[in-house]
Design a protein with these regions (language model features):
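Methionine-biased hydrophobic packing positions in alpha-helices, especially
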Residues: 8-9, 71
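Short hydrophobic beta-strand element within catalytic cores of glycosyltransferases
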Residues: 14-17, 33-34
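A charged, aromatic-enriched C-terminal amphipathic alpha-helix characteristic of glycosyltransferases
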Residues: 58-69, 76-107
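Classical protein tyrosine phosphatase
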Residues: 17-21, 25
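Short hydrophobic faces within alpha-helices
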Residues: 7-8, 16
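Short glycine/serine-rich donor-binding loops of glycosyltransferases
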Residues: 2-5, 20
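Short amphipathic alpha-helical segments and helix-helix/interface helices
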Residues: 5-6, 24, 93, 106
Length: 109
């Protein structure tokens, strides 16, 4: 779900995320710097995921280039004193406030 990403958005930070998986429920081109995923690979990290089930986004050279580009763009804005709050991200995060979440739960319970 990537709650940490949503928390950063609530703080108005400029976030970088893949355009893949659960966080696409709240991340889009208006509120995040997205990395386009072209392929998936077997989920294996040698600790928790051992390749038996599931796939995750493959980070190949093109995705690393996108990540570097997004990082450079954000850093350049900061260096030039042009980095502002990400108001689109803040607005998005309000949809997932505790108040709104509680109201949705009450509505369906």
């Amino acid at each position: 779900w990537n709650l940490e990403l949503l928390e950063m958005m609530a703080c108005g930070k400029h976030v970088i995320a893949t355009n893949y998986s659960a966080h696409t429920e709240f991340c889009n081109a208006d509120n995040a710097n997205l990395i386009e995923i072209e392929a998936k690979e077997v989920a294996y990290d040698g600790i928790w995921f051992h390749g038996q089930t599931g796939k995750w986004a493959a980070m190949k050279e093109n995705q690393l280039d996108q990540l570097i580009s997004h990082m450079r763009s954000i850093h350049k804005l900061k260096q030039d004193n042009l980095l502002k709050l990400n108001y689109s991200a803040i607005q998005t995060s309000h949809q997932f406030s505790w108040k709104n979440t509680a109201e949705m739960v009450i509505k369906y319970v």
